[in-house]
Amino acid sequence: MAAPAAPAAGETGPDARLEAALADVPELARLLEIDPYLKPFAADFQRRYKKFSQVLHDIGENEGGIDKFSRGYESFGIHRCSDGGIYCKEWAPGAEGVFLTGEFSGWNPFSHPYKKLEYGKWELYIPPKQNKSPLIPHGSKLKVVITSKSGEILYRISPWAKYVVRENNNVNYDWIHWAPEDPYKFKHSRPKKPRSLRIYESHVGISSHEGKIASYKHFTSNVLPRIKDLGYNCIQLMAIMEHAYYASFGYQITSFFAASSRYGTPEELKELVDTAHSMGIVVLLDVVHSHASKNSEDGLNMFDGTDSCYFHSGPRGTHDLWDSRLFIYSSWEVLRFLLSNIRWWLEEYCFDGFRFDGVTSMLYHHHGMGQGFSGDYNEYFGLQVDEDALIYLMLANHLAHTLYPDSITIAEDVSGMPALCSPTSQGGGGFDYRLAMAIPDKWIQLLKEFKDEDWNMGNIVYTLTNRRYLEKCVAYAESHDQALVGDKTLAFWLMDAEMYTNMSVLAPFTPVIDRGIQLHKMIRLITHGLGGEGYLNFMGNEFGHPEWLDFPRKGNNESYHYARRQFNLTDDDLLRYKFLNNFDRDMNRLEERCGWLSAPQAYVSEKHEANKTITFERAGLLFIFNFHPSKSYTDYRVGTATPGKFKIVLDSDAAEYGGHQRLDHNTNYFAEAFEHNGRPYSLLVYIPSRVALILQNVDLQN
């Protein structure tokens, strides 16, 4: 038989392309070992990694490295010099002229012109007064004046402004020069990265039970101790980056370097973060780099008089669904701006990482609109992927983890893009975690569409365990999304209007309240135990907060009634909210002791449709759930991997959790060498209806 013909010169087959990709991406072989289905897309990972490496190389060649490049906030904006002068710098490539005005100049718009530099940059030096004090004192108001090429005179806030305020009933924000003589000094070191991440998703403004905007100081004094007591070791702060529209929930950013002044001063936010650190709690910022507000007078939009500057020009620069502007991630100065923003929050405020909002919108040119992701790998590669945005995310993760190796980054991505949470050295996105966004949808679907006796145990387990191998997920039963007006929290789906009338401990349990309290605990525990490598709860949901969240707006007559968290409900000893709060606390504290979130994925030994039971093992614990609305089971056999004596360590039916006390916690359960459900040992337990148990092998513990 004749030998096969050699390939023509320059021709490359699939094997040759794979070899080339493996040669270019340092740890791609490991990624393809983890997920062999990615092999046909090796060239995509090669291209992404080479582009990422090229940008890093170019930054090194032209800027002296990413360390220097990400310090844009040290020169852009306005800064006090050692001689008492003021140095100002802006990037406004479309401007005809740039000027600084403010209280210091009597608002003369043209008295202080900037000098034009290369690449669209402008700078200004303002000498000090004769006594060497700065001409622009701390707390004074400023504006950048732009003269456009069409002759317009535009008043703007610097994109690098550190503090902006809106006074009285003004429509727009004022830029305030923030340079206090005695800035806050951090007293406590950053906690180490938790081995298990238990996140308390928080919004400072709604953290009071009163109908008003709460302050950083209120949150520090009143909410941080609650979070610590509940056993959470991480806070995710929403709506910190300044946003002109309060009802946007912080997702229409106008000033990216300014901490929202609604809640207080920058120094008070620093005190909040520092106090959390003193409690051993890490703090994540909900960072919004997926889009920006359309505001121009107090936002980035049209900063230099053009529709481009920081954003794509034309239709590509607008998000049709969000009505906001979209960054041009391939722009050198946009990269400087966004990477410097990452560094600013890490260094100036000592945040410990980020939850990146709207990642799906960034990753794809279609922004996820009208797309149903089926899991077909072809959906994650090709022309629909915005590789410039993906490269930016790789750079942002690289920067955060280079500066602070214990930094935590979480991606909000509904698409399930493969390798998003793999290291950049593998060609991945570099995130530490992704949000398990299908889980809350599953719980809402079950509560809306199915009777309890029709819940599919296998489908619940599938949803909770359906995650990419070695890509960590943050599981949650509900987040702020489910609390917003128009939706319902789990507690409200379960108990609805009876929450207003039948939550008193002095009244007998109604069937609705009984069902609601028992299922609320079970849903949260099985999500916590089976759903991921991290867990998230939105503030107030731990105790079954009874109302949705609705910020003041025209549609509700600017009311703050629903823009609050009624922590007073769980503090009232005569109300049943305390039971849910107690369970959430003890669930977190048990995880802290046993570490199931940092343990390998659970082994599910039973998902019995007729009995409505689910059992699994994780971190040496035996989790047992009976979702049946009416059937209890005596001497129910449960499989386990180990012999020995087991004890109950968490029981949702306990009195302190609003249960019916049907289990004796002094009972010992002995696992014998009796194979069951694929496990070599098994034990017999009593599992009442609508009860969740965790058993621990005390022999192994000892």
UniProtKB/Swiss-Prot annotation:
CDD domains: AmyAc_bac_euk_BE, E_set_GBE_euk_N
GO cellular component: cytosol
Modified residues (Phosphotyrosine): 173
Binding site for substrate: 62-63, 91-93, 118-121, 333-336
Annotated metabolic or biological route of this protein: Glycan biosynthesis; glycogen biosynthesis
Reaction catalyzed: Transfers a segment of a (1->4)-alpha-D-glucan chain to a primary hydroxy group in a similar glucan chain
EC id: 2.4.1.18
Entry's Gene Ontology BP terms: glycogen biosynthetic process; negative regulation of neuron apoptotic process
Family under the similarity heading: Belongs to the glycosyl hydrolase 13 family. GlgB subfamily.
UniProt function note: Glycogen-branching enzyme participates in the glycogen biosynthetic process along with glycogenin and glycogen synthase. Generates alpha-1,6-glucosidic branches from alpha-1,4-linked glucose chains, to increase solubility of the glycogen polymer.
Protein name as it appears in the record: 1,4-alpha-glucan-branching enzyme
Organism: Mus musculus (Mouse)
Lineage: Eukaryota, Metazoa, Chordata, Craniata, Vertebrata
